[in-house]
């Protein structure tokens, strides 16, 4: 099971943290600091797996990470997870971010944190891997983006309706409105203009 997913830069600033087990906020901050110190001290040419720190569960857990440019992508997992499988999952995550943001960088993670969390939620839920097919993940994210855009259009609908009514050129104000069998009497109103 995946216990946490952490992304931080070369200076230890967290850019994303997702915990799948309950930890207090102080403990989460300690885990992030400890993980950064463990991972950042390692040479580039060494293995990308190491035993979890004391806070994340000790020797029963592993830290699996990759370092891309200025960012560390770290998955904290228990012993039931495959190290190579998680390395591949990190690669899929980074490539998916790259497709969604067209050459992802640290600023994308800062300014589009909600979208990054959506991408991550398509891949991992409750510490379990849901999807590893990058094309399927991108398709789902594109569908979410289209839905958000269509909902944004609905938010302005009342204002557009009021504007349309104000701009209507009626020769006179109707006194009765007939809709099918229903007749509605319109009270005397001042001019719309």
Swiss-Prot record:
Tissues where the protein occurs: Present in all adult tissues examined.
One GO term (biological process): synaptic vesicle recycling
Subunit structure: Adaptor protein complex 3 (AP-3) is a heterotetramer composed of two large adaptins (delta-type subunit AP3D1 and beta-type subunit AP3B1 or AP3B2), a medium adaptin (mu-type subunit AP3M1 or AP3M2) and a small adaptin (sigma-type subunit APS1 or AP3S2). Interacts with AGAP1. AP-3 associates with the BLOC-1 complex.
Protein name per Swiss-Prot or TrEMBL: AP-3 complex subunit sigma-1
Family label: Belongs to the adaptor complexes small subunit family.
Listed GO CC annotations: AP-3 adaptor complex; AP-type membrane coat adaptor complex; axon cytoplasm; cytoplasmic vesicle membrane; early endosome; Golgi apparatus; intracellular membrane-bounded organelle; presynapse
Originating organism: Homo sapiens (Human)
Chain positions found as Phosphoserine: 191
Gene3D superfamilies referenced in this protein's UniProt entry, alphabetically: 3.30.450.60
């Amino acid at each position: 099971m995946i216990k946490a997913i952490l992304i931080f830069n070369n200076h230890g600033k967290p850019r994303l943290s997702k915990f799948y087990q309950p930890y207090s906020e102080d403990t989460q901050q300690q885990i992030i600091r400890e993980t950064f110190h463990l991972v950042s001290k390692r040479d580039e040419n060494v293995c990308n797996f190491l035993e979890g720190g004391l806070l994340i569960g000790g020797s029963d857990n592993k830290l699996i990470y990759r370092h891309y440019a200025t960012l560390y992508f770290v998955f904290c997992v228990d012993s039931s997870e495959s190290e190579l499988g998680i390395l591949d999952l990190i690669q899929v995550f980074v490539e998916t971010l790259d497709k969604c943001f067209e050459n992802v960088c640290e600023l994308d993670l800062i300014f589009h944190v909600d979208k990054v969390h959506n991408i991550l939620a398509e891949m991992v839920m409750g510490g379990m891997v849901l999807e590893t097919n990058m094309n399927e993940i991108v398709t789902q994210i594109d569908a979410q983006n289209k839905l958000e855009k269509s909902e944004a259009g609905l938010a302005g609908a009342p204002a557009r309706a009021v504007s349309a009514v104000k701009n209507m050129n009626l020769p006179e104000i109707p006194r009765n409105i007939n809709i099918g069998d229903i007749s509605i009497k319109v009270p005397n109103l001042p001019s719309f203009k």
